UniProtKB/Swiss-Prot annotation:
It is found in: Cytoplasm. Pathway: Amino-acid biosynthesis; L-histidine biosynthesis; L-histidine from 5-phospho-alpha-D-ribose 1-diphosphate: step 5/9. The gene is hisF. NCBIfam families: hisF. It comes from the Bacteria. This is Imidazole glycerol phosphate synthase subunit HisF. Keywords: Amino-acid biosynthesis, Cytoplasm, Histidine biosynthesis, Lyase. PANTHER family: IMIDAZOLE GLYCEROL PHOSPHATE SYNTHASE HISHF, IMIDAZOLE GLYCEROL PHOSPHATE SYNTHASE SUBUNIT HISF/H IGP SYNTHASE SUBUNIT HISF/H. Its EC number is 4.3.2.10. Belongs to the HisA/HisF family.
């Protein structure tokens, strides 16, 4: 059985971590490479970098950051934010990313997913879906940092991009993000059941039980969290031990 992955996420702007990382052993809590090194040593299964400004002006900074991180870390690295074309994917893979995540660009033109998957393989193409509840059992995709409604049904879109060659879905509940109230489990379950590819649950983790629920109730293949790890409330090792004690197969740190 495949192991469930635990994935810390770093929000990066202009080459700096913006939701600070409060590790006592870091020389510079704002340096993504320092944070990545700490997570690598702690046994994280993967790391996600999201370039939240995502402008082409700072793309060179992001390429440099990916290269410096890949040189120092062994865990797979997913990079997203402002990825619009297969040329962007190629440049990030050459810089050292293992996977590249599309978000708004895939919503605007889903053919970009197929084009990238055909060129580089589905295994390195992630589609990030930011969804909000619009009615019981119905979720809509929002883009541009959650500011722009699309009217697109999240489950239908997930099925569409999976059929076009996406290798993985990074699913964030915008209703839960930052609330520490736990994942949106009905949303996570609906998409996990609808697609034949792995789903990473994101948005709302406040306790280790929430990580467990994302898998046991949400059906996720991986769980992503930020603040519970960044601020030192829990370690990756504690999270893995808790999930293992709940019967979830993990790669022990």
């Amino acid at each position: 059985m495949l192991k469930t992955r635990i994935i810390p996420c770093l929000d990066v702007a202009d080459g700096r971590v913006v939701k600070g990382v409060n590790f006592v052993d870091l020389r510079d809590a704002g340096d993504p490479v320092e944070a990545a090194r700490a997570y690598d040593a702690a046994g994280a299964d993967e790391l996600c970098f999201l370039d939240i400004h995502a402008t082409h002006e700072n793309r060179g900074t992001m390429y440099d950051l990916v290269t410096r991180t890949a040189e120092q870390c062994f865990m797979p690295l997913t990079v997203g934010g402002g990825v619009r074309t297969h040329q962007d994917v190629r440049a990030l893979l050459l810089a050292g990313a293992d996977k590249v995540s599309f978000n708004s660009a895939a919503v605007a033109d889903p053919t970009v997913v197929a084009e990238a998957a055909d060129r580089f393989g589905s295994q390195c193409i992630v589609v990030a879906i930011d969804a909000k509840t619009v009615a019981p059992g119905r979720w809509e995709i929002f883009t541009h940092g959650g500011r722009r409604a699309t009217g697109i049904d999240a489950v239908a879109f997930a099925c569409d991009v999976a059929s076009r060659g996406a290798g993985e879905i990074l699913l964030t509940s915008m209703d839960r993000d930052g609330t520490r109230a736990g994942f949106n489990l009905p949303l996570t379950r609906a998409i996990s059941d609808a697609v034949p590819i792995p789903v990473i649950a994101s948005g709302g983790v406040g306790t280790l039980d929430h990580l467990v629920e994302g898998v046991t109730e949400g059906g996720a293949s991986a769980v992503l969290a930020a603040s519970i790890f960044h601020f030192g409330e829990f370690t990756i090792g504690e999270a893995k031990a808790h999930m293992a004690s709940a019967g979830i197969p993990v790669r022990l740190a």
